[in-house]
């Protein structure tokens, strides 16, 4: 008989470890079913020892030890995965059990007995090779395709971690060219039958694979992962909204440390803390990061002076904008109007020579305001205020 120390994989149970006895030879990392508070739950075995070594503990115990119900899986979670989970639990000031409950998908725990496992190799020396990739989407995914082919040539697999299912579907379309044969998709909407089939096929595939999934599926049975890519790194979805508030980006980094894999953080705009780490030389760059956001949106400048000349009544909205609003309402589309106007007029210019009236202190365009029958110019940059009764500084014209 043996005594096993287990961690319940369930919320609401704060004890770090519970002890049970068993007649089976169960090793650390196994998933077993145990009775807790009148219900049977999954639990993770963290240690196992012969009962003879715990005679005094058993004799002096104020309660009787319960027996484990059954073994779900002997090697479902690998030693590197467990070590990463322990480090992440310490970082989040949470128990290992509650953290595992948040990072291991429910579908994995419920179907653990029918899932194939793979023995993890001996732990590699810890060496984190981190990098950032801050560019537009097209360039990032082009780099990902090249990286996957490079890793395949080295006999290594790649895990592309994404925050949501919609992101996974989009990435699948962008990356399917040339590597679809060895690609495996895992997300929360996968049906049970398809999930078990994909999981077991992944475990048996001798060729390196490309895995696209949410962060919870880092527990897949592949121990040849050479690169972990955290795409859309700035997404808030990576962090859980309930206790223990797990940040999957941190767990992915800890897992990369335990397995010796490279980790890449990619996004159009990375988080401030990630950019800081890059500037402190903690992370390297794959390509020089783009510091400007490129947009494909079409810009159009409309001259309202022609509209005002042709219409007797003043209208702040141009006919072109009115048509866009009308079409959006007819198609039930969303439309955002952003108006940056402050004062009576954000810009005042000379009708004769076109010179813009500027602040005399900082040379920024000055804004016309009105208060109690008084008109004045106010600079919104430096705060200078002056009377609006003036002439053009360029041509001395009075038509401002």
Range-by-range predicted roles:
Residues 316-321, 327-400:
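Cys/His-rich short segments
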Residues 1-312, 326-330, 335:
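Accessory, non-ATPase domains that flank or precede helicase/AAA+ motor cores in DNA-metabolism machines
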């Amino acid at each position: 008989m043996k005594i096993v120390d287990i961690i319940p994989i369930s919320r609401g149970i704060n004890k770090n470890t519970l002890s049970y006895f068993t007649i089976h030879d169960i090793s650390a990392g196994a998933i077993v079913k145990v009775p807790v508070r009148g219900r049977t739950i999954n639990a993770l075995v963290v240690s196992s020892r012969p009962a003879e070594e715990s005679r005094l503990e058993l004799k002096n115990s104020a309660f009787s030890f319960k027996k484990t119900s059954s073994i779900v899986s002997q090697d479902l979670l690998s030693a590197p995965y467990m070590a990463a989970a322990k480090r992440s639990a310490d970082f989040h000031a949470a128990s290992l059990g509650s953290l595992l409950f948040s990072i291991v998908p429910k579908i994995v725990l419920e179907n653990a007995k029918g899932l194939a496992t793979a023995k993890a190799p001996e732990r590699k020396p810890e060496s984190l090779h981190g990098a950032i990739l801050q560019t537009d989407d097209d360039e990032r995914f082009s780099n990902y395709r090249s990286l996957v082919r490079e890793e395949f040539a080295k006999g290594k697999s790649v895990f592309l971690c994404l925050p949501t299912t919609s992101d996974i579907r989009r990435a699948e379309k962008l990356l399917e060219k040339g590597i679809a044969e060895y690609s495996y998709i895992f997300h929360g909407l996968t049906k049970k039958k398809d999930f078990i089939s994909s999981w077991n096929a992944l475990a048996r595939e001798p060729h390196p694979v490309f895995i696209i999934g949410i962060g919870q599926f880092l527990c897949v049975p592949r121990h040849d992962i050479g690169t972990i890519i955290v795409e859309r790194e700035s997404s808030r979805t990576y962090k859980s909204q309930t206790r223990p508030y797990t940040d999957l980006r941190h767990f992915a980094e800890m897992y990369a440390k335990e397995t010796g894999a490279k980790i890449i953080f990619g996004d159009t705009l990375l988080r401030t803390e990630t950019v800081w780490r890059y500037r402190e030389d903690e992370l390297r760059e794959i390509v020089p990061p783009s510091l400007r956001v490129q947009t494909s949106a079409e810009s159009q400048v409309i001259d309202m002076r022609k509209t005002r000349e042709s219409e007797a009544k003043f209208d702040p909205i141009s006919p072109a904008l009115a048509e866009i609003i009308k079409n959006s309402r007819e198609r039930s589309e969303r439309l955002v109007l952003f108006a940056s106007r402050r004062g009576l007029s954000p810009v005042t210019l000379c009708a004769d020579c076109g010179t813009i009236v500027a602040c005399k202190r900082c040379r920024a365009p000055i804004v016309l305001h009105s208060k109690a029958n008084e008109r004045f110019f106010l600079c919104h940059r430096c705060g200078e205020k002056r009377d609006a009764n003036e002439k053009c500084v360029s041509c001395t014209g009075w038509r401002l």
